[in-house]
Amino acid sequence: MSFTRQEPPRPVIAVVGPTGSGKSDLGVNLALALDGEVINADALQFYRGMDIGTAKITVEERRGVPHHLLDSMDVTQEASVADFQDECRAAINDIHSRGKRAILVGGSGLYVRAALDVLEFPGTDPTLRKELEEECENNGLAPLRARLEEVDPVSAARLGDARRVIRALEVHGLTGRPFSSFMPQREYFQPALQIGLEVDREQLRERLAVRVHRMVEGGLQQEVERLDAVGLRSGKTASRALGYAQFLKVLDGEMTADTAAEETIVATRQFARRQLTWFRADPRITWLGWQDPELVDKAVKVVNAAST
């Protein structure tokens, strides 16, 4: 009897790191080198029309590489990590079924974890949530926090604001399980590898400032005006995006464009620091220098080593 040797499944490749570090370019270069396709894991790049303010990769910059989950939502829609998980894993399966490499690119840490790791998303109970919100409004947060300490002390110690405490109690009421039991574990859902872009923090700070000024010069305010006309303000996710929230205030006469630009720079730098903290906590990531002239070659070697 003869047996056919089965090839091990190809790992999903994830390119991660802070905003402005060059993830999109590396993703395209890896796709060209490895016969792959890119899946977007930047929550704000899901939105059609949010191009300048998200530094969305252009059609020309994609260099013929197929990109999935870009421009897949209207600005009025709310982004959902659970929905993304389903859509991303479907895209991964589709890409792999055609013999291609799936390359996940993005800096939205929870979205990357949702795609790669074993991670459950509990449902919602609008009626229970409304009851909890009314209780919080009438009696304050303290009684709800005390209740959470009884059923889920881990979450009670970690969650500070009313919205998250209410969500934790909602999940417990819905599932009978503590909210903390749904937190992501560092266990891959399927074979995967992560490549992180190591940055010089001072250089990144300067790059982010230059990038925001270029966005403004490139028409960010006009982009916000166009999106405002199609419902940007009603979108819970899109309306809070860096740059967009600030320039909505410009449209309302609450601040000048110069002030909006400076506030966007500060907020973007803070966001980049949070991204670095998130990704640095994951020991599975292989870090490569963002400005290394041999970056692509080294990244390909990391992938090939993990695939043998």
From Swiss-Prot:
Pfam families assigned to the protein according to its UniProt record, in alphabetical order: IPPT
InterPro entries reported in the protein's UniProt record: Dimethylallyltransferase, IPT, P-loop_NTPase
Quaternary context: Monomer.
GO BP term (any one): tRNA modification
Amino-acid positions noted as binding substrate in the UniProt annotation, renumbered to this chain: T19, G20, S21, G22, K23, S24
Protein name: tRNA dimethylallyltransferase
Annotated ATP binding sites: G17, P18, T19, G20, S21, G22, K23, S24
EC number: 2.5.1.75
Annotated site residue numbers, Interaction with substrate tRNA: S108, R129
Keyword list, A-Z: ATP-binding, Magnesium, Nucleotide-binding, Transferase, tRNA processing
Protein role: Catalyzes the transfer of a dimethylallyl group onto the adenine at position 37 in tRNAs that read codons beginning with uridine, leading to the formation of N6-(dimethylallyl)adenosine (i(6)A).
GO MF annotations in UniProt: ATP binding; tRNA dimethylallyltransferase activity
Catalytic function, reaction form: adenosine(37) in tRNA + dimethylallyl diphosphate = N(6)-dimethylallyladenosine(37) in tRNA + diphosphate
Coiled coil: none
